């Protein structure tokens, strides 16, 4: 797969006239690397004035959420059940080292980095690799040890993938999707479904309910209000929002 620059944050070095941002174009996640092997195809994309787009990383299977460390960028592959550590050692905006640091995971989608540690999620579990960048810089062989944070999450795979992130309160926020397209009974059986939750001292608490399938959220930098995207019901047709 081909990874295209995402919108997480502006790059620190803005010497060039063109603003470069880390920007993942969701549509590109479903194309093979060969689809963008010819850079001329990138010209088919419409960009705002003053922006450029270029291939940032290749040969990553279905990359999903991205998180930035101090020296590395981390992403997850749901289809392969893997976590990747990416590095751009010469700062040319092209990844030159791509390493798998966890595998054999159950539909891993979510990753987040905090205080030197990398957290990542399966459908029903959340793990952490402590001091991950120092481990990578020490050129260790194999894979780093991962520590289980929780396995107390529903294991239903329908909308079971987890996007994760720490909030301004330093608590870990995790959406739990509805295990269906449209349903009520399943939600009554387990109140965690169709919600956004946060981990507070080892216990889960609800932040929002009635959230069918959130695959992205963040906080307002000033008010600290939580904003999230929610995927609505499927199969309404081309003329109705979903």
What function would you assign to each model-found segment?
Residues 24-25, 35:
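Cleavable N-terminal signal peptides
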Residues 1-17:
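N-terminal secretory signal peptides that target proteins for export/translocation
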Residues 37-242:
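Beta-propeller domains with acidic blade repeats across secreted/periplasmic ectodomains
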